[in-house]
């Protein structure tokens, strides 16, 4: 990152670059971007409003609406050409709201009609904005059938289009709009095709929550305009938006250093170490997994096994309680140690908290780990100890500036991997409050503790104390089972031991962890019934495919 001030960085957002200012009718085919493996910037409503206002000043009237509707139509036409979803002259049914989202929908209907595709519009109330009125005139001139009530059944339509409300919705869907949202969502839930324009109606595009806890449309596909939005990838947004495609509409925004990104391999892959022939086990670091009080040995072993398969050179398990096994039969490569037998400060990285409990042994082990000048991952019970113990919390925060930390401390802040309840304890709020602003909560924790935060959940957020943040697009409900968090901790710990910077280690860990779940689910091992132990071998394969492809 550069050393510009926050004000200077944020000022980048108000200077959009415009494509050639030509009338909408002569625009080329719309550019549609798939977010897959792209570190796209994720824009808030406020940022997009600034972009849209400035961009519209340099364009002929109605151009952005014309481009948005054309992008939606182009997406439908391309999809239908590949999957036959409009075969047999099945028409498209379009729900248009009173604002600019409804105007986008009307333009889409006009473009479909001009392309010879039957389209019908349901417009429950009259449109209210100047741009939308223009779009209505164009649709009527093109002969688009427009009614004020929906048909008795939507089953005859090839696609349904949600153009009710976009990012400007500030209150829950009510009345006829709520009824339409239910009907449209029912179609998506029964394997029908639903396209949302910009965002599913009723979704808060900043947070991924439903607006004020109300209803929201469930879509199978979303074409989002100008730029991607964080709410499409977090909490309910992932279920409601379906497959997301970005239509920039010819406006390109220079990206500030601290803008939120969609996590992608280009953000972390360059930081992996080379695997030269002249390497040995010490080259790729020694990790100690610290945890496993009496009766809780499984969690650290899961983490340690994952660390082995994520490329760490040597992996130790430092148990803190009695009764630990002498070795791990499936993985005798792991080195298991009874309490107090391993010199933690001799390790290249530590992963602390798995199966640790909250007793005296756990507090002592965490305090010892915090005093070690090595990269440190903190998970599970260790996070709960920090939340309940002011001295431990202050010690963690002090590591960010303490002289006792490694010389490269800014490169290797601690990594904390809380789930929402653990994060809420650290912030002294409720989990519900935290979930209302996952990005803000993760950034607040990063600032409070001078640490990289991995806020787990649907759309895991990774936030750095230097202001960088990303939302992870991989993973699915298969990860909602015991032990998967331990596996994630082991993966990130292994990457810290291999000397990846903390932020990039966290990005890589959550991406690979989620990708492994996606891969297993696609192969039939999920989303129901996947076990944590299945993830690590798949992570190994994906890591080698992505970072270390075979030599010719």
Give the ranges of each region predicted by the language model.
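Internal gly/pro-rich beta-alpha loop/helix module
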Residues: 159, 164-258
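N-terminal small/polar loop signature for handling phosphorylated ligands or for N-terminal nucleophile
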Residues: 107-188, 325-343
């Amino acid at each position: 990152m550069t050393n510009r001030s926050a004000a200077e960085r944020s000022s980048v957002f108000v200077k959009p670059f415009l494509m050639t200012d030509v009338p909408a009718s002569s625009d080329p085919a719309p550019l549609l971007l798939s977010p897959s493996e792209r570190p796209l910037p994720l824009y808030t409503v406020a940022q997009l409003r600034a972009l849209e206002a400035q961009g519209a000043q340099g364009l002929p009237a109605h151009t952005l609406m014309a481009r948005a509707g054309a992008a939606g139509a182009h997406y439908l036409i391309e999809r239908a050409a590949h999957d036959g979803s409009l075969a047999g002259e099945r028409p498209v049914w379009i729900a248009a709201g009173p604002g600019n989202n409804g105007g986008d929908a009307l333009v889409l209907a006009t473009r479909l009609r001009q392309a010879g595709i039957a389209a019908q519009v349901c417009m429950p109330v009259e449109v209210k904005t100047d741009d939308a009125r223009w779009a209505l005139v164009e649709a009527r001139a093109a002969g688009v059938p427009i009614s004020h009530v929906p048909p008795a059944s939507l089953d005859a339509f090839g696609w349904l289009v949600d153009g009710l409300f976009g990012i400007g919705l500030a209150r829950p869907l009510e009345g006829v709009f709520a009824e339409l949202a239910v009907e449209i969502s029912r179609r998506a839930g029964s394997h029908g095709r639903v396209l949302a324009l910009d965002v599913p109606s009723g979704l808060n595009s900043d947070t991924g929550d439903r607006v004020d806890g109300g209803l929201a449309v469930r879509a199978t596909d979303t074409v989002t305009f100008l730029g991607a939005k964080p709410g499409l990838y977090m909490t309910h947004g992932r279920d409601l938006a379906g497959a997301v495609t970005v239509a920039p509409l010819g406006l390109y925004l220079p990206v500030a250093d601290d803008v939120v990104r969609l996590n992608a391999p280009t953000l972390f892959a360059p930081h992996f170490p080379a695997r030269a022939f002249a390497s040995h086990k010490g080259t790729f670091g020694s990790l100690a997994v610290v945890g496993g009080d009496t009766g809780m040995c499984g969690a650290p072993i899961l983490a340690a096994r994952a660390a082995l398969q994520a490329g760490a050179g040597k992996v130790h398990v430092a148990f803190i309680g009695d009764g630990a096994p002498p070795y791990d039969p499936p993985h005798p490569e792991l080195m298991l140690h009874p309490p107090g037998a391993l010199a933690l400060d001799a390790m290249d990285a530590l992963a602390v908290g798995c199966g640790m409990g909250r007793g005296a042994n756990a507090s002592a082990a965490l305090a010892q780990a915090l005093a070690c000048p090595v990269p440190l991952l903190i998970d599970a019970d260790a996070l709960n100890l920090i939340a309940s113990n002011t001295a431990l919390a202050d010690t963690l925060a002090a590591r960010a500036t303490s002289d006792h930390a490694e010389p490269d401390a800014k490169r290797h802040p601690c990594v904390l991997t809380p789930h929402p309840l653990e994060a809420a304890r650290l912030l002294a709020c409720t989990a519900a409050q935290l979930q209302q602003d996952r990005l803000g909560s993760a950034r607040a924790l990063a600032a409070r503790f001078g640490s990289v935060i991995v806020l787990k959940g649907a759309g895991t957020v990774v936030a750095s104390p230097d202001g960088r943040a990303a939302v992870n697009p991989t993973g699915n409900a298969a990860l909602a089972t015991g032990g998967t968090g331990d596996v994630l901790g082991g993966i990130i710990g292994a990457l810290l031991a291999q000397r990846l910077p903390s932020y990039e280690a966290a990005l890589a860990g959550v991406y690979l962890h989620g990708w492994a779940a996606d891969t297993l689910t696609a192969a039939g091992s999920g989303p129901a019934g996947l076990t944590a132990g299945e993830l690590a071998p798949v992570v190994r394969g994906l890591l080698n495919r992505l970072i270390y492809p075979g030599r010719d």
